[in-house]
Design a protein with these regions (language model features):
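Motif-centric detector for short Cys/His coordination patterns
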Residues: 1-133, 137, 141
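Active-site environment of non-heme Fe oxygenases that use a 2-His-1-carboxylate facial triad
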Residues: 98, 109-149, 154-155, 159-171, ...
Length: 414
């Protein structure tokens, strides 16, 4: 069945509470009158796409009805009782917005879950191809959406050019760390402003240590946490420092299968992540962030849509007395799954390599590495999740106009 046939109206009937459409592909859709009246996008009513609407929902009759209707294979036309307002709906638009359970399920993006087996063939792209080809850029963004991560090879090797990759994903997010963060180092005196790793008297950022880091999500202490993280390697470690990744959605799936009651415990129990950050330079102020959310978030279909795992940032648990032990029990079981080697992939990142991942799905870490000169240089930038989705929608509509609009996981958004 072609897309053209899928969006052609074969038959239509006006029922008591709405319109029933029989499509050429034998699918049936039903649209309530109140929904149709509210979704009119004529010049007078306006569109939700730009937020310029003359239509007020509170002024629509509670049970609006048309006194006249007509249709052809490509459109539906209604004249409404009362004010005689005329509404026209394109068949393609109606099919793309059909809210039957079957159509909503078809539009909902389904992530591709993975474990250690993906290590031999992770989704990988070449920077020059992605930068110069909209179709390759779409494939890269789709891979991040599907798998939660991808590698990019041959990316710019200087911090001043790092935005070339970042902007292919979305608008760079600025936090209290500044325009970008060079992890594992102090700023050097070099002209390109790239930092190198040096021994420090005290550690305020876990990225400054050389020991192995267990898989985790970043910044669980923020109410609006990082969506997409982008690592760009300027100087790799020659010994150790391999990146590690875990699919948090697959870990949650196993957790739910093996321990359903404990899974529900972490879905409903709010845990506080916190971070105290002393001032880094003269004139800066210290900061103390705290955010309280569940570790696992599910959507309206009870499917996992967001993960927020960083045991190092869990503040002293503040729950009713009888919830403390069950919560710890659930945490221990979940973290054992998260840290299971059968879920973890590990690979080196060489100079010019980049790693893009969904911080609200994929946990990241690294193996220990040796202190060297020149030191390990890895640039960290981030992009909001909705920016990646925005670019994905625009590219899909331009390059694959026949495909219906997809709905994407909203991560940890409450």
């Amino acid at each position: 069945m072609t897309q053209a046939q899928r969006t052609k109206i074969e038959r239509l009937s006006c029922e008591k509470d709405g319109i029933t459409i029989n499509w050429r592909d034998c699918t049936v859709s039903h649209f309530h009158f109140i929904w149709l009246r509210h979704q009119c996008e004529c010049a007078q009513c306006g569109s939700s796409l730009n937020g310029v609407r003359g239509l007020r929902l509170d002024l629509i009759p509670e049970s609006p009805k048309p006194h006249k209707y007509s249709f052809d294979s490509d459109s539906l036309h209604l004249i409404w009782d009362g004010d005689g307002h005329a509404s026209t709906y394109e068949a393609r638009w109606l099919r793309d917005h059909c809210y039957s359970a079957e159509e909503r399920a078809l539009r909902k993006h389904q992530p591709v879950l993975w474990d250690k087996q993906i290590e031999t063939d992770p989704p990988t792209f070449i920077f020059s191809e992605v930068e110069n080809s909209s179709s390759r850029r779409l494939e890269m963004l789709q891979a991040v959406c599907d798998y939660g991560f991808c590698k990019v090879e041959g990316a710019p090797g200087l911090a001043q050019e790092a935005d070339r990759l970042v902007e292919l994903v979305g608008t760079k997010r600025i936090t209290h760390y500044g325009d970008f963060e060079l992890s594992n180092k102090k700023m050097s005196d070099t002209s390109d402003d790239i930092a190198t790793l040096t021994e420090k008297d005290s550690i305020n950022n876990v990225g400054d240590i050389r020991q192995a880091l267990q898989p985790h999500c970043d910044e669980t202490y923020r109410m609006s946490t990082i969506g997409i993280t982008i690592f760009q390697v300027f100087e790799p470690s020659t010994e150790g420092g391999h990146s590690t990744l875990v699919d948090g959605f697959e870990a949650a799936r196993r957790f739910h299968t093996e321990f359903p009651d404990d899974f529900e415990e972490l879905v409903r129990t709010p845990l506080t992540g916190q971070r105290f950050d002393p001032k880094h330079a003269e004139g800066e102020l210290p900061r103390w962030y705290r955010c309280t959310l569940p570790m696992i978030r599910v959507d309206e279909d009870q499917e996992v849509c967001g993960i927020r795992v960083n045991e190092r940032q869990i503040a002293p648990i503040d729950l009713p007395y009888d919830q403390v032990v069950p919560t710890y029990r659930a945490l221990q079981k979940f973290l054992k799954i998260v840290y299971d080697p059968s879920l973890m992939i590990s690979f080196p990142l060489t100079k010019g390599d980049s790693l893009i991942f969904n911080n609200q799905r994929v946990l990241h870490g690294r193996t220990a590495f040796k202190l060297e000169d020149p030191g390990r240089q890895v640039l960290t930038n981030s992009v909001d999740l909705e920016d990646l989705y925005s670019n994905l929608r625009i590219l899909r509509r331009r390059l694959k106009p026949e495909e219906p609009l997809q709905t994407y996981s909203q991560g940890m958004v409450t």
